[in-house]
A protein has these predicted regions:
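A domain-level signal for the structural core that forms small-molecule/cofactor-binding pockets
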Residues: 1-143
């Protein structure tokens, strides 16, 4: 973890999904000051009619997209908002998603709910000092 999961109604070529995954990983690692190797991205193509929302009272449901971000607990709301906006921009630019039909939801976890066998086991809990600790490429940083 972090685990960035995008649910969409459309289908996209693997090369486009790879481009989006790379952009999302790079942005998340930079903005959240984490080791990019801990980030996983899923782009779930649910197919036509796979995910819906009612945009206004008394309106019909419309197709939408949803980005779920499983992250370590403790990031300030302002930082989470900035990350959400940046990741939405990638989804809009790369996949052509509509901003008014894309939501972001965060699920926050303690570090010991994230296990990375190749990176030494459980992630440490997030601390405010991590944001100032240096570059996103640091292998000791968690998600």
């Amino acid at each position: 973890m972090p685990y960035l999961q995008l649910d969409v109604n459309e289908h996209y070529p693997s090369s486009v999904k790879r481009t989006l995954a790379a952009a999302m990983c790079e942005t998340y690692a930079r903005m959240m000051s984490v080791d990019i190797r801990r980030i996983s991205v899923a782009i779930r193509e649910l197919g036509d009619g796979g995910i819906w929302r009612i945009p206004e009272l008394n309106a019909e449901p419309v197709p939408v997209s949803l980005l779920m971000l499983d992250i370590r607990r403790g990031r300030p709301a302002d930082l989470r908002m900035q990350v959400a906006k940046a990741l939405c921009e990638h989804c809009i630019r790369v996949l052509g998603l509509r901003e008014d039909r894309l939501n972001v939801e965060f699920t926050q976890h303690d570090g010991d709910e994230m296990y990375h066998p190749t990176l030494g086991g459980f992630s440490p809990d997030w601390t405010p000092g991590e944001a100032d600790a240096g570059s996103s490429g640091n292998a000791t940083r968690a998600g």
